[in-house]
Amino acid sequence: MAAAEPASSGQQAPAGQGQGQRPPPQPPQAQAPQPPPPPQLGGAGGGSSRHEKSLGLLTTKFVSLLQEAKDGVLDLKAAADTLAVRQKRRIYDITNVLEGIDLIEKKSKNSIQWKGVGAGCNTKEVIDRLRYLKAEIEDLELKERELDQQKLWLQQSIKNVMDDSINNRFSYVTHEDICNCFNGDTLLAIQAPSGTQLEVPIPEMGQNGQKKYQINLKSHSGPIHVLLINKESSSSKPVVFPVPPPDDLTQPSSQSLTPVTPQKSSMATQNLPEQHVSERSQALQQTSATDISSAGSISGDIIDELMSSDVFPLLRLSPTPADDYNFNLDDNEGVCDLFDVQILNY
C-alpha cells in the first residue's frame, strides 16, 4: 500500500518528528465575559440617563441660556433645539413656573424676556447704582442716630435745668433776648392757657397795596394776654405795652402828648430781669390803667404814629364792667366775629 501524504496545512512539523505524524490537539481556551457597553449620553443613537432627563437640571440649563441671551430675550424653539428637548411641553412647564414667580414675561407666543435685564440696560451700572444707594442709606442712618443722640442730650439738659431749684429763678426770657432773635420785626408776645387755638388766615391785599393780617385766638379755659414788643434799633430799649391798650390811649385827646424821656424806656417790669415772664405780664396788666406819664411805657412818637393812622391798630375788645356778653361763637368763628371790628392794616 502506498503511504498517505500529509495534509498541507501550512504548519511545519517540529524538528525531531517525522513527517508522517500530526501534532496533538490543543484544548479549547475559555474566553472572559465582556462588560456591557456604557450608555450613550444625549446621543441620537442612545437613550438619555435619568439625571439628564430631570426637570431641575433642565431648568438650570434653561435659565443659563436665558441669562446669556441678548437683552434677556430667548426664543423657545431655539432653546428646545439647544437643550435637545423632544417634548416641548417640558419647556413650557419651566416658563409657566418662571412667569408665575414674576421672573420672566412673554414677548410673543414663542419668545420670553428675563425681567432682570431690559433693553439697553447695563447690569454693571445697575449693580454700581445699587451699591451707591446702599452706602447712602447707611450714611443717612448714621446721621439719624447722631441726631437722635443729640436730641436725647438736649432733653436731658433741659430736664436737669428745670429740675434744679437754683436754676428755676433764671427760667425766663427778657425782652431784649426776644428782640435780638427777631430783629426788625414787630413782635406779639402771647400768654395763653394750654389748649388755646391759634389761627392765622391767609392775608388779603388791601386797597393801598398792603396785606391785611389777622390772628385769631380762642381759649375755653382762661384769659389770653397779648403784649406788643417793639424795638427800633439795636441801641434802643424794647417798648412793651399790652394789647388792647389802656382806655386813655384809645380815646383821642385834644392835648398833645409829650414824651416822658428822650429815649424809649421800657415798663417798670423791665427793672426785674430775674422774674418769670408770667409775673412780668401780670405786672403789665396791673399797670396798664395808670397814667402815661407815671408809667413811662410809651413815648410820644409812637402814640402820635398810632393815632395818626386811619384805623387805630390796637382796639380794646373787653366790655366795660357794666356790660356783659350776650353772644356766642360757633366752632368755625373767631374773636373778630364776636365784635364789629374792621380788618387791621399793618
Curated annotation (Swiss-Prot):
Assembly description: Component of the DRTF1/E2F transcription factor complex. Binds cooperatively with DP-1 to E2F sites. Interaction with retinoblastoma protein RB1 or proteins RBL1 and RBL2 inhibits the E2F transactivation domain. Component of the DREAM complex (also named LINC complex) at least composed of E2F4, E2F5, LIN9, LIN37, LIN52, LIN54, MYBL1, MYBL2, RBL1, RBL2, RBBP4, TFDP1 and TFDP2. The complex exists in quiescent cells where it represses cell cycle-dependent genes. It dissociates in S phase when LIN9, LIN37, LIN52 and LIN54 form a subcomplex that binds to MYBL2.
Recorded GO CC terms: chromatin; cytoplasm; fibrillar center; intracellular membrane-bounded organelle; nucleolus; nucleoplasm; RNA polymerase II transcription regulator complex
Subcellular location: Nucleus
Region (RBL2 association): 323-340
SS bonds (residue pairs): none
Signal peptide boundaries: none
DNA-binding annotation, residue ranges on this chain: 47-118
Protein name: Transcription factor E2F5
Ranges spanned by the short sequence motif DEF box, renumbered to the chain: 81-118
Family matches, as InterPro entries: E2F, E2F-DP_heterodim, E2F_CC-MB, E2F_WHTH_DNA-bd_dom, WH-like_DNA-bd_sf, WH_DNA-bd_sf
Annotated Pro residues bias: 22-40
Keyword Acetylation found: no
Any one GO molecular-function label of the UniProt entry: DNA-binding transcription factor activity, RNA polymerase II-specific
Region (Leucine-zipper) residue spans: 76-98
Record-stated family: Belongs to the E2F/DP family.
Gene this chain is encoded by: E2F5
A biological-process GO annotation: cell projection organization
